[in-house]
Design a protein with these regions (language model features):
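N-terminal carbohydrate-binding accessory modules
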Residues: 1-36
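Conserved small/polar residues in nucleotide/adenosyl-binding loops
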Residues: 240-247
Length: 252
C-alpha cells in the first residue's frame, strides 16, 4: 500500500471508556490533524470473554467511526495480555523464569513457547482478522506488542534450547569444549541429561541461552506474520519492539 501523507496518530481503546464519547474523540483526533489510530492489541479478554465466546462490538464501533471520520486504522493482535480464563485452564501458560513462576494479573506474563498458548493465540488472531479484513480503513497490522522473551525457562523453551544446541553443535564433545564445561563438573555427555538452564554457573552458556531466547521472539513474530498474511491485502505488517535490532527479519 502506498501512502501520500505522513501517518500521525494515537492508540485508541473504546473498550476502556466508562462512557460513550467515540464520536467526540474521533472528531477531535481528526481536527488535531491526526490521520491514523491503532486499536485492538490490549484486550483479548474483551474480544473473547469466555473460551470460544467472541464479542467484537467495540471493534466494529471503532472501525465504523474511523470510516466516518476518514481515519486510517492499524489493528494489533491481542496476544501480549492473556485472559484470566486462559490462565486458569492452562496454568502452564504462565511463564517460568529465573525468579520462579509468573502470577496472573500483569501483562506479558506468558510463555510464548507453550503449545496451549499458541493454539488459543492463533484462534483469537484468526477471529480478529476475519472481523477486520474487509474494512477499507484498515491499512496495516501490528504483531503482538512490545514483545520480549520474558525470560521464559519453561520445559518447552528448554527442550527447544537443547534442540537448538544439537543443531549448532552436532558433536557433543565440541559443545563441551566450546563452553568449557569440564569446569566444576558441568560436562554434558548425554543431551537427554541436559540440566535446567536456570542453574548454570557458566556465563557463556547463559549468554547462549539469552541469544536463543531472542530467536524465540523472532520465531514468534514470524509465526504471527504467517497467520496475518492469510487475511491481509497489500497492507504492511509491523511490530513494536525496543530490541528490534536483535530479532528483526523480513516478516512481510
Amino acid at each position: 500500500m502506498n501512502f501520500n501523507e505522513i501517518l500521525y496518530g494515537v492508540a485508541y481503546y473504546d473498550e476502556y471508556m466508562p462512557y460513550d464519547r467515540i464520536e467526540t474523540d474521533f472528531k477531535m483526533i481528526r481536527d488535531a490533524g491526526m490521520n491514523v489510530i491503532r486499536i485492538a492489541e490490549s484486550t483479548w479478554s474483551t474480544w473473547e470473554p469466555k473460551e470460544g465466546v467472541f464479542d467484537f462490538t467495540h471493534l466494529h464501533r471503532m472501525l465504523d467511526c474511523a470510516t466516518k471520520y476518514e481515519l486510517k486504522v492499524i489493528v494489533g493482535t491481542p496476544t501480549y495480555a492473556i485472559p484470566s480464563w486462559l490462565a486458569k485452564k492452562y496454568p502452564d501458560i504462565l511463564a517460568v523464569t529465573h525468579n520462579g513462576k509468573e502470577l496472573y494479573g500483569h501483562r506479558q506474563n506468558m510463555d510464548i513457547t507453550n503449545p496451549d498458548y499458541l493454539h488459543h493465540a492463533q484462534i483469537i488472531i484468526e477471529k480478529l482478522m476475519e472481523q477486520v479484513k474487509d474494512y477499507d480503513c484498515v491499512i496495516g497490522f501490528q504483531l503482538d506488542n512490545e514483545t520480549k522473551p520474558y525470560d521464559t525457562c519453561s520445559k518447552y523453551a528448554q527442550a527447544k534450547f537443547v534442540e537448538y544446541l544439537k543443531n549448532e553443535f552436532p558433536d557433543i564433545d565440541e559443545f563441551n569444549r566450546e563452553f568449557g564445561l569440564d569446569y566444576w563438573s558441568n560436562r554434558v555427555d548425554d543431551w537427554d541429561a541436559f540440566p535446567d538452564i536456570r542453574g548454570t554457573i557458566n556465563m557463556s552458556l547463559d549468554a547462549e541461552y539469552k541469544k536463543f531466547q531472542r530467536k524465540l521472539v523472532t520465531d514468534f513474530f514470524a509465526w504471527q506474520a504467517d497467520i496475518v498474511k492469510k487475511y491481509k491485502r497489500d497492507d504492511p505488517v509491523s511490530y513494536t519492539h525496543l530490541r528490534a535490532h536483535e530479532t528483526s527479519q523480513d516478516l512481510v
